[in-house]
From Swiss-Prot:
<comment type="similarity">
    <text>Belongs to the MinE family.</text>
</comment>
<keyword id="KW-0132">Cell division</keyword>
<dbReference type="Pfam" id="PF03776">
    <property type="entry name" value="MinE"/>
</dbReference>
<keyword id="KW-0614">Plasmid</keyword>
<dbReference type="GO" id="GO:0032955">
    <property type="term" value="P:regulation of division septum assembly"/>
</dbReference>
<dbReference type="InterPro" id="IPR005527">
    <property type="entry name" value="MinE"/>
</dbReference>
<protein>
    <recommendedName>
        <fullName>Cell division topological specificity factor</fullName>
    </recommendedName>
</protein>
<dbReference type="InterPro" id="IPR036707">
    <property type="entry name" value="MinE_sf"/>
</dbReference>
<dbReference type="GO" id="GO:0051301">
    <property type="term" value="P:cell division"/>
</dbReference>
<comment type="function">
    <text>Prevents the cell division inhibition by proteins MinC and MinD at internal division sites while permitting inhibition at polar sites. This ensures cell division at the proper site by restricting the formation of a division septum at the midpoint of the long axis of the cell.</text>
</comment>
<keyword id="KW-0131">Cell cycle</keyword>
Amino acid sequence: MNIFRLFNKQRTAPAARERLQVLLAHERSSAGSDLVSLLREEILAVIAKHVELDHDKVQVTIDRNEFVSTLEIDVEIPLNAAVQAA
């Protein structure tokens, strides 16, 4: 047993942080397509409650960088769309 080892504890925070970053990057990349399709369907369902729309004229894009993920949804609503009461 080395007595210096008792007083010189290793710092594990950098290794834990790196493992967490790898795990988060993996989960973001694997769950991205499922999340986008789920969000698209739920958002379209909410919009369809209030306005008639063509589901084919909806574009969904997701942009990812190191710190932020951005979901952009373009919905084309005709000028003569019937507005429904909620």
